[in-house]
UniProtKB/Swiss-Prot annotation:
One of its GO terms (cellular component) is mitochondrial inner membrane. Keywords: Antiport, Lipid transport, Membrane, Mitochondrion, Mitochondrion inner membrane, Repeat, Transmembrane, Transmembrane helix, Transport. The keyword Transmembrane applies. This is Mitochondrial 2-oxodicarboxylate carrier. It is found in: Mitochondrion inner membrane. The chain crosses the membrane at residues 16-36, 69-88, 112-132, 166-186, 204-224, 276-296.
């Protein structure tokens, strides 16, 4: 193996390790908000006696009826997926960015286009895990009463198969969710970071990067949430058991808009922003600092 190939492999391993650490830290800190977000997104009517009245009400009800572990339902699939997911997210972003560099595009275009490519690639890896995660998150039984992650995955495969009606349902919505988020997230972060002077003070530099990452995650959440709502409706339980109401991504958006109004496409926005705002800052900081440490020590 040539020296250049060894160097490329070494660089990829650093990206995988740094991305995995970033994903693990972010998911462990922010998963409770993801559970709340998903519950809001699958609600169809405020008149439903099981509907949450507010963000505070959702936390109180989940804690009272399902216990502390209720906030960590469905956490195993994202943990299992985080290392390959974040490895794909960051390594393919770097790969697409390098490829686009040969096309003489401006940085203003290179970063969002590379982000879009990384998001679409990431969606392919993560979608089966998302199907299992959403199914577990919307289960309102006590944590100890619900099926295990692997038992639930086997149940989906047995009943619905591996395809777009089974373990890969909601695939187009996942493509839209991740593609648009990464396009906005990376595009905003790197373009803004390059235009705001860095600081020699480590604390100020940390806050500068975290602040830009926070805003990047927030903006990405606002732009991609209609796809996230569609994904939750398709991958979650259908209104009538045995009857599939939500199928394609855009058809689902149309149905939600027609029956519930435009604001229904933004259900769960507050917990999503509360998660992916600070989560976006945390993830990029953990990635950058871990990657820098690995460059110095490995």
């Amino acid at each position: 193996m040539s020296a250049s190939n060894v160097s490329l492999l070494h660089e990829t391993c650093r990206q995988v390790a740094a991305g995995g650490c970033a994903g693990l830290v972010e998911i462990c800190l922010m998963h409770p908000l993801d559970v709340v977000k998903t519950r809001f997104q699958v609600q169809r009517s405020v008149t439903d006696p099981q509907s949450y009245k507010s963000l505070r009400d959702s936390f109180q009800v989940i804690f009272r009826t399902e216990g502390l572990f209720g906030f960590y339902k469905g956490i195993i699939p994202p943990i299992l997926a985080e290392t390959p997911k974040r490895a794909v997210k960051f390594s393919t972003f770097e790969l697409y960015k390098k490829f686009l560099g040969y096309m003489s595009l401006s940085p203003g275009l290179t970063f969002p286009i590379a982000g879009l490519g990384s998001g679409l690639t990431e969606a392919v890896v993560v979608n089966p895990f998302e199907v299992v995660k959403v199914g577990l998150q919307v289960n309102r039984n006590m944590f100890t009463e619900q099926p295990s992650t692997f038992a639930y995955a086997r149940q989906i495969i047995k009943k619905e198969g591996w395809g777009f009606q089974g373990l890969n349902k909601g695939f187009t919505a996942t493509l839209g969710r991740h593609g648009i988020f990464n396009m906005t997230y990376f595009g905003f972060y790197y373009n803004v970071k390059d235009n705001i002077p860095s600081s020699k003070d480590p604390t100020l530099e940390f806050l500068r990067k975290f602040g830009i990452g926070f805003v990047s995650g927030t903006v990405g959440s606002v732009f991609n949430i209609p796809f996230d709502v569609a994904k939750s409706r398709i991958q979650g339980p259908q209104p009538v058991p045995g009857e599939i109401k939500y199928r394609g991504c855009f058809k689902t958006m149309e149905t939600v808009y027609r029956e519930e109004g435009i604001l229904a496409l933004y259900k769960g926005l507050l917990p999503k922003v509360m998660r992916l705002g600070p989560g976006g800052g945390v993830m990029l900081l953990v990635y950058e600092y871990t990657y820098a440490w690995l460059q110095e020590n490995w």
